[in-house]
């Protein structure tokens, strides 16, 4: 982030790290956590498909216990790593887990995460994105899988941790959005009156 700031001093520099669950949890957890400990002002987004899809379907730390995959034929023996809780304990000001079944919600969460990281400190977003090829499902079955896992008691019920500083940012963003909507409505009304 420092290099971006020195290279582009007049531009807002947001850093967003995009990685799969293998890179975030299994291979890169140490580096990810160290950035959180140091309060690096960037957002980490983990695309959690619960396995190593690019290399044949091996289990990842985020695979659910008991899940059977091509390269994990006996099922995973250990619980899924609770990464949102780790992010919270490591110093993230905003940490959440959700599925990609509701694109508008995903957009809102990511915008919040990026702005909180810019203004307050590190943020973490875990997005459940099932690999339908590896789990043997059709597209709509994958969507149903996400929706089912969001239900109460499901493994992807949205969890969210927000520090008081981050909540202030979220509240301000909501107020600004409401003001923009009211201004647009008033402008549209003026135009309608002028046309009539």
Identify what each model region corresponds to.
Residues 60-64, 141-144:
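Short, hinge-like loop/turn segments at secondary-structure boundaries
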Residues 17-19, 94-99, 124:
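Short catalytic-loop micro-motif centered on adjacent basic/acidic residues
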Residues 49-51, 102, 127-134:
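Glycine-rich beta-alpha junction loops
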């Amino acid at each position: 982030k420092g290099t971006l700031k020195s290279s582009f001093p007049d531009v807002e520099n947001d850093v967003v790290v995009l990685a799969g669950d293998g890179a975030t949890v299994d291979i890169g957890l140490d580096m990810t956590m160290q950035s959180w400990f140091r309060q690096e002002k960037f957002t980490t987004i983990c695309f959690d498909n619960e396995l190593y899809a690019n290399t044949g379907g091996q289990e990842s730390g985020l695979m659910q216990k008991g899940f059977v995959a091509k390269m994990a034929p006996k099922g995973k023996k250990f619980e899924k790593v609770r990464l949102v809780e780790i992010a919270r304990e490591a110093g993230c000001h905003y940490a959440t887990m959700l599925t990609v079944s509701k694109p508008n919600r995903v957009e809102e969460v990511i915008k919040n995460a990026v702005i909180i990281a810019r203004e307050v400190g590190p943020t973490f977003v875990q997005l459940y994105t099932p690999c339908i090829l590896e789990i043997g499902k059709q597209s709509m079955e994958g969507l149903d899988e996400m929706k089912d896992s969001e239900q109460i008691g499901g493994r992807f019920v949205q969890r969210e941790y927000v520090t008081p500083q981050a909540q202030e940012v979220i509240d301000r963003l909501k107020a600004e959005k409401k003001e923009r909507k009211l201004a647009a409505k008033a402008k549209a009304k003026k135009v309608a009156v002028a046309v009539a």
